[in-house]
Amino acid sequence: MGARASVLSGGKLDAWEKIRLRPGGKKKYRLKHLVWASRELERFALDPGLLETSEGCRKIIGQLQPSLQTGSEELKSLYNTIAVLYYVHQKVEVKDTKEALEKLEEEQNKGRQKTQQATAEKGVSQNYPIVQNLQGQMVHQSLSPRTLNAWVKVIEEKAFSPEVIPMFSALSEGATPQDLNTMLNTVGGHQAAMQMLKDTINEEAAEWDRLHPTQAGPIPPGQIREPRGSDIAGTTSTLQEQIQWMTGNPPVPVGEMYKRWIILGLNKIVRMYSPVGILDIRQGPKEPFRDYVDRFFKTLRAEQATQEVKGWMTDTLLVQNANPDCKTILKALGPGATLEEMMTACQGVGGPSHKARVLAEAMSQATNTAIMMQKSNFKGQRRIVKCFNCGKEGHIAKNCRAPRKKGCWKCGREGHQMKDCTERQAKFFRENLAFQQGEARKLHPEQARAVSPASRELQVRGGDNPISEAGAERRGTVPSLSFPQITLWQRPLVTIRVGGQLKEALLDTGADDTVLEDVNLPGKWKPKMIGGIGGFIKVKQYDSILIEICGHRAIGTVLVGPTPVNIIGRNMLTQIGCTLHFPISPIETVPVKLKPGMDGPKVKQWPLTEEKIKALTEICMEMEKEGKISKIGPENPYNTPVFAIKKKDSTKWRKLVDFRELNKRTQDFWEVQLGIPHPAGLKKKKSVTVLDVGDAYFSVPLDKDFRKYTASTIPSTNNETPGVRYQYNVLPQGWKGSPAIFQYSMTKILDPFRAKNPDIVIYQYMDDLYVGSDLEIGQHRTKIEELREHLLKWGLTTPDKKHQKEPPFLWMGYELHPDKWTVQPIQLPDKDSWTVNDIQKLVGKLNWASQIYPGIKVKQLCKLLRGAKALTDIVPLTTEAELELAENREILKEPVHGAYYDPSKDLIAEIQKQGQGQWTYQIYQEPFKNLKTGKYAKMRSAHTNDVKQLTEAVQKISLESIVIWGKTPKFRLPILKETWDTWWTEYWQATWIPEWEFVNTPPLVKLWYQLETEPIVGAETFYVDGASNRETKKGKAGYVTDRGRQKAVSLTETTNQKAELQAIQLALQDSGSEVNIVTDSQYALGIIQAQPDKSESELVNQIIEQLIKKEKVYLSWVPAHKGIGGNEQVDKLVSAGIRKVLFLDGIDKAQEEHEKYHNNWRAMASDFNIPAVVAKEIVASCDKCQLKGEAMHGQVDCSPGIWQLDCTHLEGKIILVAVHVASGYLEAEVIPAETGQETAYFLLKLAGRWPVKTIHTDNGTNFTSATVKAACWWAGIQQEFGIPYNPQSQGVVESMNKELKKIIGQIRDQAEHLKTAVQMAVFIHNFKRKGGIGGYSAGERTIDIIATDIQTRELQKQIIKIQNFRVYYRDSRDPVWKGPAKLLWKGEGAVVIQDNSEIKVVPRRKAKIIRDYGKQMAGDDCVAGRQDED
């Protein structure tokens, strides 16, 4: 007993004994209740000790609660007692049991909401989360190609506008640093932006390292290391480590951190790309409030301000800068209104019809008592309309200006709006409404409704002569009719009055007659038999009987007999104007605008033949009946031409509208889908169905405000009558917005179904749907029917004609089988003569087939299409093209199938060479089961070789794989590692390619010949030259050898360049297996040194053939006209009567300078005023400068303070090199040892000479040492290690190392010690070589960049200061002050201002300049003004 009583002690026991058992009752809780409770707990096998803490009580409550519904009275009492005890422990004051239970329920509801939110957040679409596999390990699911593709497209379309940030945030949900880097990689081309992003990432990483110093000593076993900044950025951490950090306990969310850093960087980029200030965002007089809010928040996101400031901006500026109409409403809402309330309240305000609505409202309130119905069948007064929202009379909810009432206007519950309400109301009569306000939904004639056969409504309309909706609108009779609207969710049963009796009857549009049961009618009757679904029944026929239906009267024949249900047939329904309506689905319209400053199209209709006019009239009448188009009057000034064509293989006509002009004027749309889905990316599914959406575009409504621009006119023959004019209510065929809006609507419609059935895969492309699942066929088909019903609810039909249930499925031009796919059968036409159009179609078919048929070639066929030819021109097939076509026919004879993708297996890509610059490839996961195949045949340059082409093919395949599967395959290439390495070392600027292995599939890729770097001893030397006369096109080519041989041939129709090549060809043809050739043509040398093995030029191909036959070839260059023996002789040989000799001063000086400094051609051309071609030839003739071609130049956009540092080795010594990235300026020094001490000393020297903000190094021990860190800290330099998303992050300094070594090689013999040679080389590089941006030398460029940076910074300060001012000014004769205008510049005597978009110069005496925040005018005569302006 004692133990049990000790549950509460002291103060708590006092509180316990003050609580009443019932509200207002006398009895209170006592100690005995606790003793009883602990005994009861034992009965329920619960520990009585739990009563001693609030946590224990909560556990007990959790156990008892599920049993409360079915439990005994004792159980409920126990639950109540413990609830009270729980609050006593919590020290929360409760008066009685009821209050404790209410509090408990409230607390539990809050908890539930939180968990729901949390699960909702968990349920957010995570594109590539870390998931748990069957073994319970956390594994990574890589980015989906759609995500990557969407991200690339966002950047392409939006550049770096503010929307990019939320898009990035959404797409990178749950991503690891590696995923984020992949995303950044795909947009790495935007180098300026990436540089800014890199800077931010490095700043944040350094800050992280500063706040989280590395822990001393080794890491205990079983524990993972703490991430460094570079680990978070994914540079120095592996994917496995990232997963461990993200899923550890406690977790380190490296992905989220890195994402935050990137978003910080993106903010800076957006700021740079979209520099609009939030103060400039004002709502236009007619701009919808929603659009204004969108612009406001788009700009707010880009503002660099704290969250508090942004909050203040939202609270004050949003209202302050709204237009007067909206401002009135927003101020009435008061300061605490949420954004949603604001948007709801301002709905419709600001639109063009707003003023009219306000007027109509005022008029209807003033006059509605006096309005009587004008129609013959309506007796009595018109009903007063009442608003669903505010309950006031005189307007409807659509026009209500009060804040929108929360919850549904139909059922009163919160969480949805009336249009989404699932409560199906059968009682729709105005007498007994389901709404408290007592007003059914009013259907305005202006709601021109388009038709789809999905959801039908009955409208009971008054009057014998129903007027057309458009007509009603024009004649201004909008307020005269008010119809009940009956939805068909349930049977349309209504109460009718017949013969003084009330009966319930079914409105049946399918019945011809009205049939009632058990009703006594006056007058005579005659017997009749009527047929129904259940057979024939005998009835009595009464004529001229009055029936009252929904307040409308009709007189007609009524049949009385034993009918299962009373039926009102069409004989009565037509009299009361009842119509069937097929409203277009409740799909939201997407607002569409014209391009700014443009008006709609006004293109005249061209004349049409009588049969076309007749066909169009019929089609339009049909479309109007279905509500797809509406008639319009002459007040619409727009027009688009319309015409008709016969449908393929049919006598039926088809209406075509030429929307080209409207398309030019319509805003641009974001292409929702970036490409078509590919079957190789489909995962294998047990059950598959393919559906097609019928009349796809016509099921989606067009924005009401845009419809007027789609106007067109059907003319009459011989202008007998004025043309009939129509406009579209739905998405028109041929209009540029239709595909994007349809795709967007379709996605929104499918989203709920996808969310409900996550295991069902739906690929949607326009109106084609592929649905796959792993369900049994029966269950799968049930799901398909669910999907079809779901689509039908929205008005989208899926016709049975195109509903494919059994394989093979025809989808998107493919044929899908359960375990394989292929392209739909391809028939190549047989023709005697081919036109350009025929060949284009043929090439298209073959390209389509090449996705799965390996070995398809189209190069020769494409050659036939070269040159500008008309589509109908006849093209004779060349022998090669005929052969190619025959080969393709053979390949297509045997059907080939592709496999489906299995995410658990690796992708492998294999490439084969087909010859003539064509390549074929297969991507597979298991041998002989290709996922897809393809071909590559691009010649990026006129002369190329196989290795170059192979790298290009690999890159094309990598990109294709990322798009389809989201990852790159492993490559199997027909090239030996040695050949690749030779190419790689020779051409150090060759591109990176992914992981690959050698596969021996002939023909192997090889470098067919190699040029010697030194002259061949003992081989004959040929001096070659060619010349041509520009006017006559005649020329000569020839050679002279060191052994006295010579030859010259005459050429016609040639050029200098061709003649030079011809001379080389002669020399190769007439020489032995080893030869030295000396040319004076830089052009010829350039081509041959790139070692091409194929060319578009026949002559180069002949030279290649000769080169391959030779054992050794040495090719050298000498400058022309320099008195070089053999060269001079051959020059005379070929110049006779051909070449005009050109003598230039300055060549000698340039050559001398070059021998000393080996400066590049740009420096010589500029310093000695010689033509570029001569300067290039001097460089090329120098054997020391002829080691390699010039580097291919990329574009690195870099800020002025960045330097890259690296150590390189030469002659066993260490050279420390520093490059100023923006200019290429070099500092280098031989250091005694690769230590931190030496590096730090070098760094301080560098910082003492130049403004160094950031250094970029690799992870060498000397750079990562504490000494260097200390030096960086002292000098205020930020240190970076590699760019996270760029494998060649040290590219600039790496290429400079090579450049430096090259220069040292050229001047090494001029210096005894290496350290002297290094400094000489640095001098040459910095001051004797010109080129790049501005044609400066690196030294000049550095100084220019730094000076410009200082000027820009100062100017920026001035501009920022100046932009804070506003100017009020007076024009020449107008005494009124205008303004405020923006101050652009302030000079001594005048200011430059911008008013609206006009820029003006105003004298100082006529301008008053004020700061933006003040209302005080500050002119020249005001002290405050003068202080402000400075």
UniProtKB/Swiss-Prot annotation:
The site feature described as Essential for RT p66/p51 heterodimerization is recorded at 983, 996
**Which positions bind Zn(2+)?**
1154, 1158, 1182, 1185
| Segments carrying motif Nuclear export signal | 16-22
Q: Where is the lipid attached (N-myristoyl glycine)?
A: 2
Q: Where is the segment annotated Disordered? A: 451-474
Q: Does the record bear Lipid metabolism in its keywords?
A: no
**UniProt region (Interaction with membrane phosphatidylinositol 4,5-bisphosphate), positions on chain:** 73-77
List every stretch annotated Interaction with Gp41: 7-31
Q: How is the cofactor bound?
A: Binds 2 magnesium ions for reverse transcriptase polymerase activity. Binds 2 magnesium ions for ribonuclease H (RNase H) activity. Substrate-binding is a precondition for magnesium binding.
- Activity control: Protease: The viral protease is inhibited by many synthetic protease inhibitors (PIs), such as amprenavir, atazanavir, indinavir, loprinavir, nelfinavir, ritonavir and saquinavir. Use of protease inhibitors in tritherapy regimens permit more ambitious therapeutic strategies. Reverse transcriptase/ribonuclease H: RT can be inhibited either by nucleoside RT inhibitors (NRTIs) or by non nucleoside RT inhibitors (NNRTIs).
Q: Name one GO biological process term.
A: DNA recombination
- Reverse transcriptase domain: from which residue to which, for each copy? 626-816
Q: Where is the RNase H type-1 domain?
A: 1016-1139
User: What PANTHER family does its record include?
Assistant: ENDOGENOUS RETROVIRUS GROUP K MEMBER POL PROTEIN (PTHR41694), RNA-DIRECTED DNA POLYMERASE-RELATED (PTHR41694:SF3)
Q: What else is known?
A: HIV-1 lineages are divided in three main groups, M (for Major), O (for Outlier), and N (for New, or Non-M, Non-O). The vast majority of strains found worldwide belong to the group M. Group O seems to be endemic to and largely confined to Cameroon and neighboring countries in West Central Africa, where these viruses represent a small minority of HIV-1 strains. The group N is represented by a limited number of isolates from Cameroonian persons. The group M is further subdivided in 9 clades or subtypes (A to D, F to H, J and K).
According to UniProt, the name of this protein is: Gag-Pol polyprotein
Q: Which organism is it from?
A: Human immunodeficiency virus type 1 group M subtype F1 (isolate 93BR020)
